Design a protein with these regions (language model features):
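Acyl-donor (CoA/ACP) binding surface of acyl/acetyltransferases
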Residues: 1-13, 17-29, 68-171
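Proline-rich low-complexity regions
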Residues: 2-5, 43, 61
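Structural motif
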Residues: 32-33, 60, 120
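Conserved GNAT-fold acetyl-CoA-binding loop/helix
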Residues: 33-54
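Short, hydrophobic secondary-structure boundary micro-motifs
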Residues: 36-38, 64-67, 164
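A short helix-loop-beta-strand connector motif used in the catalytic cores of GNAT acetyltransferases and
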Residues: 53-66, 75
Length: 171
């Protein structure tokens, strides 16, 4: 059973992560396409995922949510860290490959950005996408983010240095 609804859109629901979601999260994060898209190089095992879950539920400076389509978990989205004093946070997200290109990421980001601005009263949401991830860059631009800069060869993924493109959206 998925966790309680946090934010609901037409096609996705953002829910609290529950312990029963850990197996999905662990399997998804070990998918090479997902891992690459978020800059990971080492797959998580179930114990590492459980540790992540424990940190998430005890951390007041982040919001980490399960993205579901109907009742099916399809990804994760979060705001981290939430800096209330500066009014800024960063959004991070991933969706399992079989749901790419369906608009679920767009709707999930729109929901969480609205939450950041309207409920948390933040001034700015930032995001990053790697140079090879054109789809993520297009998604961010589609929902209104502006590219603010590029850190060249900032991260080492799968044997190659990759650029990191930084985006921002101001309320």
């Amino acid at each position: 059973m998925p966790g309680p609804v946090f934010l609901k859109g037409d096609h996705v629901t953002l829910r609290a992560i529950e312990e029963e979601n850990l197996e999905f999260l662990q399997e998804a994060i070990t998918d090479p396409q997902v891992r690459r898209s978020i800059g990971g190089s080492t797959p998580y095992n179930l114990e590492q995922e459980r540790e992540f879950f424990e940190n998430v539920i005890s951390d007041n400076e982040t919001v980490q949510l399960l993205i579901s389509n109907e009742e099916t978990p399809i990804g994760m989205i979060g705001l981290e860290p939430i800096n209330q004093e500066a009014g800024v946070t960063e959004v991070g997200y991933w969706i399992v490959p079989e749901y790419w290109g369906e608009g679920f990421g767009t709707e999930a980001i729109e929901l969480i950005v609205e939450y950041a601005f309207d409920r948390l009263r933040l001034h700015k949401v930032t995001a990053r996408a790697f140079g090879f991830n054109d789809a993520s860059q297009r998604l961010l631009e589609k929902v209104g983010f502006t590219e603010e800069g590029v850190q060249r060869e900032q991260i080492f993924i799968d044997g190659e240095y990759q650029d990191t493109h930084w985006y921002g959206l101001i309320d």
